[in-house]
Regions:
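An anion/pyrophosphate-binding glycine-rich loop and adjacent beta-alpha core
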Residues: 4, 8-136
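A glycine-rich dinucleotide-binding beta-alpha-beta segment and adjacent secondary-structure elements
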Residues: 139-185
Length: 185
């Protein structure tokens, strides 16, 4: 099964590729580990700063959607209220571990921030810079976050149909972002 929680270093491509050196002839270059919170339905955008899917879907569907994006990666964005959001999302299966294991997400945020895999910023613009968005892609990113906040306020995802209970505001600093790609579990 392809999972949607492979943590990827900024600027690195990921995805399912042929590799004669890997078991079964396939590999997932770029992913550096499983980041369980990556399966939470937070805002996800491509390298152009554009939202491209309903983030509240099965693991493999999110992975397959990423294969159509530049570098086969996407950024996941959330704010300081992630704990309340995760509790409200009430995901099931192994993604629920983020909710059930006390301190899991907080510990992983701290660990991976220290390794340069999760970015933390006081503003959305600063987060965009840290994540590598520049020029029009940065403008798109900032506009996408603003649009996502509008959808949250309406409690209606007019763009991709995500259930209202899975929407979250991105307004309270610090803001967090990381790059994800498909990984084999």
């Amino acid at each position: 099964v392809l999972f949607d929680r492979g943590l990827v270093a900024p600027g690195v491509d990921a995805g399912y590729v042929d590799s004669e050196n890997a078991f079964g002839g396939k590999a997932f270059p770029g992913t550096v580990g499983q980041y369980n919170p990556g399966s939470q339905p937070f805002l996800k955008v491509n390298r152009h700063g554009e939202r491209f899917m309903n983030e509240s879907q099965e693991y493999d569907n999110a992975s397959h959607a990423s294969f159509q994006q530049p570098g086969h990666v996407y950024a996941m964005i959330h704010d300081a209220n992630f704990r309340e959001d995760v509790d409200r999302f009430h995901t099931i299966g192994c993604s629920a571990l983020t909710r059930y294991i006390p301190g899991m997400m907080e510990g992983q945020l701290e660990q991976y921030e220290g390794e340069g895999l999760i970015m933390k910023a006081d503003t959305i613009e600063e987060l965009a810079d840290k994540m590598g968005f520049t020029g029009a892609d940065k403008d798109n990113f900032v506009a996408t976050v603003a649009r996502y906040n509008e959808l949250y306020d309406k409690q209606n995802d007019e763009d991709f149909g995500k259930p209202a209970s899975r929407l979250s505001a991105i307004r309270t600093a610090p803001f967090y972002g990381c790059w994800l790609g498909a990984s084999l579990l």
